[in-house]
């Protein structure tokens, strides 16, 4: 008989049977080998068919193993085996059955049917399972659905619905779907479209994360609960698994064949199945090769005739990009817009999901945490949508608490490491003989004993707290299971079981949970098992870098003493320091306008008075490093076209993909100090871009993404009016008026009006220069310390430096040059000459007109 008359699945099974025969040293391939191969075949139709008819698969496997063990074995096999006469006879019988059914190819199930007809050991084994041949034949007819086997791959296209879809209604019945809260209007609109006679295909369109897939799951739950019109009752909602449909389609036409078989099975169900296609845009162009038809075009006729009941889901951008281009496909769908829920709706959704997350993570989630998740995610995570981002916050915060429960608490871990360290040290000291070592060993032994007692006490507390937490989690899990059982009993109409669960089991479990909670009311020492607002705020801070967590005592003190800390770097300029400190305090106390930057300042004053230095000091205060500042030198933006560098080049221009210099920096660090240095040197068009930032705290880049500036402190520095400041030294009011005139002449009124505060820096006096000298020398000393050298200056040398470095016109910069010339240059020569070796204390004093070192 010709092998090419067998379906590809049967050919593979014969190949596996041959391998089995060779492996067991059998002389030929017997029908038993073939049935064993068919039974174990990946993705084969024989095992599901046998289970459907009522075969005991394990019993059949054992019988086959027994038969295989009884077959004769050969010594020194060559590895070459052929079909036995019994197997050839079986395949001929299957061939006759195929001809009777009008098949062009012999399929696996006909071999099984022929085996039951045989009066052989295999036939007896199959019939001993208590299943009649007639029952098997009926099951085969149902499997084939009246279709003939006219293709070698026909077996693979069978059971297409089981292979390429996921039954959402079944998952809803098993309680595996999360509850869907709200979204009634969207679900009602979806049902309304599904009830139409033709083009009854809704497509859910909305931003990523607004809950499009959840609406489909909500529809599945309503179908199961019978909360739908009669036209949808009893229907099944299947989600198409696009990955399974495409995966492994190696040859041309194989993908189309799979899709066609899926559509055929759907049409046979006569409208009893609704197909849910998530990421609908993937259907457009899927499987398209040279001369091939894509999935979207194959769906069109079925959609138009109403044979395919379909619910799609895709995002606005992808709908526009893929589906709107294909007008013929678009008109077959009816749009259902899914808007982002409000904060209140999100809170309701989170309350509905709370129990699922509590059971999964085995922790309690407080209502405060739910409200905080909705509010904080809405305010601080601007590039994602509710409710997805709020759910993620709850999930991650709960996961964090669970991780702490499962692993050793930090206190115990620290003690453990300390004990190991001390024990290693004591072992080393035991080898020493001198008195000092013995005394040290005694002290160490006492310390080890004390720490071991502390460790064992804490370990006991940890064990009891852990047991308490786990007990509560187990009861919660039982409550969740009982509620799922109650739903199943309600659907079946089992009133006895419903009464038992509703009035007996669930109230008892809830009472037990209350008792456990009452017992554990005292605050745990080591373990937290509740997700509160604080945990949510910590996760938001980790995601965005914005400090929204509750301030610790140390941070409050630091903020209250902010001016003092800034003055350690910035000498004088009290007005500017106070203005900046107030802006930061407003932001951290949560009192700043949520729709504007935390603070926007224009620093004016002559060169070298500390405008840029104050920004660096602020960045260091907030982030412990002055590198955390987004610094933009506005002198680089003197041309009109350079505006594009701030927000990104327009589409079609070089550099479009790179994004904007300012927008990208703030997207990466939404909580930062933005310094626009020498702002008056920029082209006037740059200020038009800044208007939006200063007023609304937002800026749209060239990609259409909105960048959030609400958590930034924006500082612009300028030298405008510095000549007037020098002329009017001592008269603050006249100085300010003159400077504001200069600013008004250069900037437009709408720009000046949007700045929170215009700060005029005073020229530096001799006293301030003395303070700055100490700071500059302190930096030099820290550099010398790396070489193990120290430096001290006599009062005369210090006065000399101040006298040389003081220039009211140029501020503190001449001082830096003076230190370089009088201190750093001669010191460098002396160090290189080898005069000062590591460990030397260098002193500088004045001799004549020079500063000398000794």
From Swiss-Prot:
Q: Where is this region: Repeat 2?
A: 83-146
Give me the ranges of the annotated region Repeat 1.
6-71
Gene3D superfamilies membership = 1.10.8.60, Clp, N-terminal domain, P-loop containing nucleotide triphosphate hydrolases
Q: Where do the Clp R domain residues begin and end? A: 3-146
Extract one GO cellular component term from the record. cytoplasm
| Matches recorded under SUPFAM superfamilies | Double Clp-N motif, P-loop containing nucleoside triphosphate hydrolases
Please give the Gene Ontology molecular function terms for this protein.
ATP binding; ATP hydrolysis activity
> Where is this protein found?
Cytoplasm
Stretches for region NBD2: 555-763
Name the principal localization, coarsely classed: cytoplasm
GO annotation terms (biological process): cellular response to heat; protein refolding; regulation of DNA-templated transcription
Binding positions for ATP 2 per the UniProt entry: 605-612
Q: Which InterPro entries match?
A: AAA+_ATPase, ATPase_AAA_core, Chaperonin_ClpB, Clp_ATPase_C, Clp_N_dom_sf, Clp_R_dom, ClpA/B, ClpA/B_CS1
Q: Does the keyword Chaperone apply?
A: yes
Cite the entry's keywords alphabetically.
ATP-binding, Chaperone, Coiled coil, Cytoplasm, Nucleotide-binding, Repeat, Stress response
- Function description: Part of a stress-induced multi-chaperone system, it is involved in the recovery of the cell from heat-induced damage, in cooperation with DnaK, DnaJ and GrpE. Acts before DnaK, in the processing of protein aggregates. Protein binding stimulates the ATPase activity; ATP hydrolysis unfolds the denatured protein aggregates, which probably helps expose new hydrophobic binding sites on the surface of ClpB-bound aggregates, contributing to the solubilization and refolding of denatured protein aggregates by DnaK.
Which family does the similarity line name? Belongs to the ClpA/ClpB family.
Read off the PANTHER family from this record: ATP-DEPENDENT CLP PROTEASE, HEAT SHOCK PROTEIN 104
Q: What is known of its domains?
A: The Clp repeat (R) domain probably functions as a substrate-discriminating domain, recruiting aggregated proteins to the ClpB hexamer and/or stabilizing bound proteins. The NBD2 domain is responsible for oligomerization, whereas the NBD1 domain stabilizes the hexamer probably in an ATP-dependent manner. The movement of the coiled-coil domain is essential for ClpB ability to rescue proteins from an aggregated state, probably by pulling apart large aggregated proteins, which are bound between the coiled-coils motifs of adjacent ClpB subunits in the functional hexamer.
- The name on file for this protein is Chaperone protein ClpB
Q: Which organism is it from?
A: Pseudomonas putida (strain ATCC 47054 / DSM 6125 / CFBP 8728 / NCIMB 11950 / KT2440)
